[in-house]
């Protein structure tokens, strides 16, 4: 018994300290560990992350099953996840549903188009008023300084909910960036991650403050040369860099975005002098002691024009270098001193910008001239300050307080209406191929009495000197002689202010000649005019000289000596406007301004050239920077002889008609 007792207590102790088996435990519920949060596409991007999020859309009036409009609201996001600051960000959004953009927060359309704007073919946005996106390294990860969120509201057509009208593409258009094809993250979101082009060396130092200046056909500098708390003085410099670009009677316009107004100007003037909008606006509440009668303009979008030469030395209005030339800006090849135009403005600011360093240039710049190419201008870009000679005469340079550059380039839209046209003629054909019907457009009132679609009719040489409205009898008689069927109604005129006749005057064994005549049918004179002609290379190889024009070969658009550049000789560089005929018997006929010269070509280097065909006629004609519309036809030769022999009776018939039109 004494031996069994310790064994009993030992077994009891073993059962007491041994835990029960799994089968003896009550059942437990296993809780799985939470899944990791999905990684955002932006977190995987080490460059510039772009996203386009469609928020909502709804049907809007009117009801139209063929072209139903819908409202859309979207958000465009630009996030800098890279190692360098993104200056002056530019993002292309490939709208594709005939969108009309109504509003965009914290951004502007780069080409200066005002809202609402047609953006159905895509558009480029730029940040405003904040245009630079800093890095996480610079800001310790402050997303407010790294991100731009643009809320877009507009109208699109024919994409009904629940379908989503996403753009075809989004991409960063800043130079040196590569963007892959966007990825559809969901039915409503499009994203892409843009990275630096490895072939471009970039200065990634944190101290880089301004972008380098960019080339363009025309550049505008906005230099703040004096800065005060409530106003500043700026110098605006327009410079032409295109050898075939120019401006006549330029008009410059822009938008003040912060209620600024122009107090004074020198070297230029607004087309409307009016301070009414200041008196009845917020400016009068701030500038209570200011006499607004001395303010030049309070227009939100003023139009600025150049001054006449008589104001050049005016101490109040002029006295600015490179001002006061009636708005003429020439190519450098003609006169470098006249390729620049300058004026100054004293700009009054509004709160909260009452600080010397609070400087904001106007936006949406546009510049145009009369019978000149169209320019598309980008937004102001902050660049390195401009240096200019010290006005005190000291041998030093002064720096502007701040400088912005606006780059403008010549554009040629498919729907653009030309402003000048060309007619063809040749020694081997007695008919003139006139400018095309409605070459420079036709107004709706004119279309009621003539045909805008019917090709223009051949005309006799005499008719080339007459305005279109005085050519009718001559044209009818001439086409009757040629046994041509006359259309009804007759074709409309070309409606061009300037026309150029290209006449092949001769073609012989050693060379050939062309006579060029420039006609000014408008009401504006053209001082310092120029004409540029581009032809096929074989013809240009034979160019020798022009007799009454100053002519030379010019290399443009990457070519070598591919353009004949012509201007008037001293005393012959003024193309006057159309004027009344001095002969009282012809008082109903207007006489165009006219300049003419013969151009000599050699066949020494081009023995196989066929000048009677396309080789002897231009591929492009440019007058004062504006490309002129060429005819659809070329003069035709008949058996190598002049075409269309005329009998004595035909001569009598024709000149009777010609005499009648002059009565």
From Swiss-Prot:
Signal sequence extent: 1-23
Keyword Disulfide bond in annotation: no
Cellular component terms per the entry's GO annotation: plasma membrane; side of membrane
Pfam families, alphabetized: COB_C (PF25079), COBRA (PF04833)
Chief localisation class: membrane
Transmembrane segments: none
Glycan-modified residues: 63, 111, 121, 169, 203, 326, 355, 397, 409, 429, 470, 550, 561
Superkingdom of origin: Eukaryota
Lipid-carrying residues in chain (GPI-anchor amidated serine): 638
Tissue expression as described in the entry: Expressed only in flowers.
Keywords: Cell membrane, Glycoprotein, GPI-anchor, Lipoprotein, Membrane, Signal
Entry similarity comment: Belongs to the COBRA family.
This protein's name: COBRA-like protein 9
Source taxonomy: Eukaryota, Viridiplantae, Streptophyta, Embryophyta, Tracheophyta
């Amino acid at each position: 018994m004494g031996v069994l007792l310790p064994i009993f207590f030992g077994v009891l102790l073993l059962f007491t300290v041994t835990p029960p088996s799994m089968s003896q435990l009550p059942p437990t519920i296993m809780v799985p560990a939470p899944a990791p949060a999905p990684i955002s596409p932006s977190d995987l991007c080490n460059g510039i992350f772009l996203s386009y999020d469609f928020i909502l859309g709804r049907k809007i009036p009117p009801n139209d099953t063929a072209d139903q409009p819908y409202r859309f609201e979207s958000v465009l996001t630009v996030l800098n996840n890279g190692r360098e600051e993104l200056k002056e960000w530019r993002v292309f959004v490939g709208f594709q549903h005939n969108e009309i953009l109504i509003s965009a927060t914290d951004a502007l359309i780069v080409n200066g188009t005002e809202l609402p704007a047609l953006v159905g073919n895509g558009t480029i946005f730029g940040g405003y008023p904040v245009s630079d996106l800093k890095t996480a390294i610079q800001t310790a990860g402050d997303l407010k300084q790294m991100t731009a969120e643009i809320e877009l509201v507009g109208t699109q057509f024919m994409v009904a909910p629940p379908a989503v009208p996403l753009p075809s593409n989004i991409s960063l258009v800043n130079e040196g960036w590569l963007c892959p094809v966007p990825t559809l993250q969901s039915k409503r979101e499009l994203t892409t991650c843009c990275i630096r082009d490895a072939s471009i060396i970039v200065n990634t130092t944190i101290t880089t403050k301004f972008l380098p200046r960019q080339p363009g056909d025309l550049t505008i500098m906005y230099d703040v040369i004096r800065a005060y708390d409530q106003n500043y003085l700026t110098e605006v410099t327009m410079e032409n860099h295109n050898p075939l670009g120019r401006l006549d009677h330029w008009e410059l316009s822009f938008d003040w975005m912060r209620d600024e107004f122009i107090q004074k100007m020198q070297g230029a003037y607004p087309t409307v002098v009016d301070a009414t909008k200041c008196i009845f606006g917020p400016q009068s509440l701030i500038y209570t002691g200011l006499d607004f009668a001395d303010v030049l303009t309070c227009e939100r979008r003023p139009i600025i024009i150049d001054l006449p030469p008589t104001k050049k030395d005016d101490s109040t209005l002029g006295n600015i270098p490179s001002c006061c030339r009636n708005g003429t800006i020439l190519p450098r090849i003609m006169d470098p001193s006249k390729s620049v135009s300058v004026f100054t403005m004293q700009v009054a600011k509004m709160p909260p910008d009452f600080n010397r360093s609070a400087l904001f240039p106007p936006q949406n710049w546009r510049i145009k001239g009369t019978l000149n190419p169209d320019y598309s201008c980008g937004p102001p870009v902050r660049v390195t300050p401009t240096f200019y000679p010290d006005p005190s005469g000291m041998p030093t340079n002064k720096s502007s307080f701040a400088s912005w550059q606006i780059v403008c380039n010549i554009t040629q839209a498919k729907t653009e209406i030309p402003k000048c046209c060309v007619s063809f003629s040749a020694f081997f054909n007695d008919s003139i191929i006139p400018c095309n019907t409605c070459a420079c457009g036709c107004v709706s009132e004119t279309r009621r009495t003539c045909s805008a679609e019917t090709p223009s009719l051949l005309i006799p040489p005499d008719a080339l000197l007459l305005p279109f409205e005085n050519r009718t009898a001559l044209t009818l008689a001439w086409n009757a002689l040629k046994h041509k069927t006359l259309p009804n109604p007759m074709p409309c005129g070309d409606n061009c202010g300037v026309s150029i006749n290209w006449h092949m005057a001769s073609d012989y064994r050693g060379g050939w000649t062309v006579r060029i005549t420039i006609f000014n049918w408008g009401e504006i004179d053209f001082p310092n005019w120029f004409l540029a002609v581009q032809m096929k290379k074989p013809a240009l190889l034979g160019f020798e000289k022009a007799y009454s024009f100053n002519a030379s070969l010019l290399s443009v658009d990457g070519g070598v000596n591919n353009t004949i550049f012509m201007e008037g000789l001293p005393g012959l560089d003024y193309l006057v406007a159309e004027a009344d005929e001095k002969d009282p018997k012809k008082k109903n006929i207007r006489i165009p301004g006219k300049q003419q010269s013969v151009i000599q070509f050699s066949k020494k280097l081009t023995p196989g050239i066929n000048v009677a065909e396309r080789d002897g006629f231009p591929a492009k004609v440019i007058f004062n920077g504006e490309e002129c519309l060429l005819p659809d036809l070329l003069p035709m030769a008949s058996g190598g002889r002049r075409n269309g022999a005329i009998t004595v009776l035909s001569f009598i018939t024709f000149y009777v008609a010609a005499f009648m039109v002059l009565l």
